[in-house]
Amino acid sequence: MRNCCRERGFSVGCLEPETSFSCASDVKPSPDMDSVSSQDSLYLPNSIGASLQDQDLWSQFHQEGTEMIITKSGRRMFPQCKIRLFGLHLYAKYMLLVDFVPLDNFRYKWNKNQWEAAGKAEPHPPCRTYVHPDSPASGAHWMKDPICFQKLKLTNNTLDQQGHIILHSMHRYKPRFHVVQSDDMYNSPWGLVQVFSFPETEFTAVTAYQNEKITKLKINHNPFAKGFREQERSHKRDDVLRTLQQSPGKRQKRKKWEDSPEADISDFPKATRVKEESVMDPAVVYQNWVSDHEANQGLTPHSPESEGVNQEQQVPTSSLNFYNKSQHRSSQHLSSPYDLGEPSSRRLTPDVATVPDSDQDSLAVLHGIPTQDSAQERTCSMNISMETPVKQPLRGTIYSSYGTEQWMVPAQGQYQPVGYTAYQTDLSTQGAVAHQHSGMSDWSQYSLFPYSCW
């Protein structure tokens, strides 16, 4: 294709980056072009032209020295490359491409507010060409609106696989626009080729802006610039601060209200509501655990004197006493709430869970100690005495609430064993079989229950 283009007098810029053309008039057709018919001469390369859009903006950057940011992931250009084409065949298919070529063989650095050469340029990476996404398209499509390369990205990653344009930092480049007549990008041969470039689009590739003037131009004209967003946020913060600022009259009014007694009274209803909250009396919920002696003395588990008792494990009384006490308690009223404020100085016994004296008597029987009169048995599960000012000694704690009969050893012959014949089929004839036994050891062969257990 290159040879074919040379025969016709054209140059392929993407294949020969050292050759470029600034405008369509630089193309010199060969003498053989005179044999082309007049109809085809309307669409010769001499008739194809291009103009740069946003030329004023590009000129502002060009005067200060345009800089383009390159990153590893790729960064879009600003100003964007945007051109307009004319002179194309309305129905012919064209492809539009762009590539970047170095301006010289030097590396640059920013020194004393100006760019200066700092050595020889690095080897140029493989030439990459960006194809416009609309390619191929008819000449009417390309000439209808300006052509923008907004998705083109620049990168410094030499191993890039995303199709971005690879450039070196601190090197100067310029973009070139190629118009190729072709119906298919891959199969059909390329036809006429026209190359355009504009001096205003020259730039220096950098990883960070060096010239402050370029930074200001980017902020002022690029709404997506980071500095522009930071400036907007600062303006918003200033607006918020202005709205929060109050006039002197409002501040004085606020100070007068805080000094007035109304500010203190406004919180008073909250305190009264907290104090008036009622607390459920635990004696109502746990009536069975309140002894008769406590009810008579006006001491409930809710009182301050009984906090320690409530935290101890309560020892229930026997089932018979519990039944009698529950009936007796149901006919009585609870103690007066005025008794709850009993001073702690009148508490003469510690908060220790104790058991009735009947259990003490049973314990004495086991150890062979003579028991006290059974009439002295108390029905309360907690022994709290408030009649005498003398401090009483602690009673022993026992972990059983059963009667003394469980500890008594039965005499010989007290139980009359009853047994049944294991193989007797007539249930009506079953009866007790009397046996004479001399000791307890002979009972082990007979059942103690008058019925069979499965």
Curated annotation (Swiss-Prot):
Compositionally biased tracts (Polar residues): 308-325
Gene designation: vegt
Natural source organism: Xenopus borealis (Kenyan clawed frog)
Region of interest (Disordered), ranges: 229-274, 295-358
Signal peptide: none
Pfam families assigned: T-box (PF00907)
Cross-referenced PROSITE patterns: TBOX_1, TBOX_2, TBOX_3
Location(s) in or outside the cell: Nucleus
Chief subcellular location: nucleus
DNA-binding region in chain numbering: 57-230
Function field: Transcription factor required for both mesoderm and endoderm formation in the embryo; signaling determinants and concentration levels may determine which germ layer is formed. Acts together with beta-catenin to activate genes that are responsible for mesoderm induction including wnt-8, eomes t/bra, siamois, mix1 and sox17. Directly binds to promoter DNA. Patterns the mesoderm along the dorsoventral and posterior axis. Activates siamois gene transcription when alone or in combination with beta-catenin, but inhibits siamois transcription in combination with pou5f1.1/oct-25.
Name assigned to this protein: T-box protein VegT
Lineage, top ranks: Eukaryota, Metazoa, Chordata, Craniata, Vertebrata
Disulfide bonds, paired cysteine numbers: none
UniProt keyword NADP present: no
Keyword annotations of the record: Activator, Developmental protein, DNA-binding, Nucleus, Transcription, Transcription regulation
GO molecular function: DNA-binding transcription factor activity, RNA polymerase II-specific; RNA polymerase II cis-regulatory region sequence-specific DNA binding
Xref: SMART domains: TBOX
InterPro entries: p53-like_TF_DNA-bd_sf, T-box_DNA-bd, T-box_sf, TF_T-box, TF_T-box_CS
One of the protein's GO biological processes: cell fate specification
Basic and acidic residues bias: start-end ranges: 229-241
GO cellular component, one term: nucleus
